């Protein structure tokens, strides 16, 4: 049986919040029988074309007032200005009713603010983009906002962290629908990890500076990241730092305050 996935968009929406999840479910159709295909629906807060935050233009399939069906999954996207936007009581009422009808509903990135303003996060455990977590907790004080989670499942409610975490959430939901093998096939098509778990930190260790950018430690860390599949030796690493192996080990221990093997894993 076909499954319907809808995503709500608005002027200023983050394009990747929309295209990431939609690509997961669209690519899944390559591996599914026609009768199991996902049907995708883009619902607009406004009619006509809407500019994304990056300048791309989206055209919704229908205005929210025309979206009265029961969706298997209803998602709301986020955007840089969404925490400051209010779409009015008519939209909020529609969103409450639509989410109440849906088998599952949720948000991508700070789309959680849209759900919060409609009263859909009261008493729930959720996540959002790390940069907006404090503001969401203030807006919806009865919610438990877990700022350092990629995605959170609370009953029928699914919320994801910032931007690309929407892909992780979508892969998780795809695996729930059709199994891990299909989700893995889609992840391979999209060249992404499958599957970063919901409890994994939003903060990548590779985005955290561990050493001065011109130091031997930093040079070697960059070299390792560029050669993750290689069988690297101390000699290789020393060469990347333009040092002898002996001197490299001494310098690396001094700057990294740990043996080479331990420091590279940090």
Language model segments and positions:
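A conserved active-site-flanking secondary-structure segment within enzyme catalytic domains
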Residues: 122-150, 185-186, 190
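N-terminal functional module of multi-domain proteins
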Residues: 1-117
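A short alpha-helix-loop-beta-strand transition element characteristic
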Residues: 33-40, 144, 178-185
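Internal, well-ordered alpha-helical segments in soluble enzyme and binding-protein domains
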Residues: 21, 91, 111, 132-135, ...
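Basic/polar phosphate-binding segments, predominantly the helix-turn-helix DNA-binding elements
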Residues: 206, 219, 223-226, 230-266
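Conserved anion/nucleotide-ligand pocket segment
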Residues: 149-189
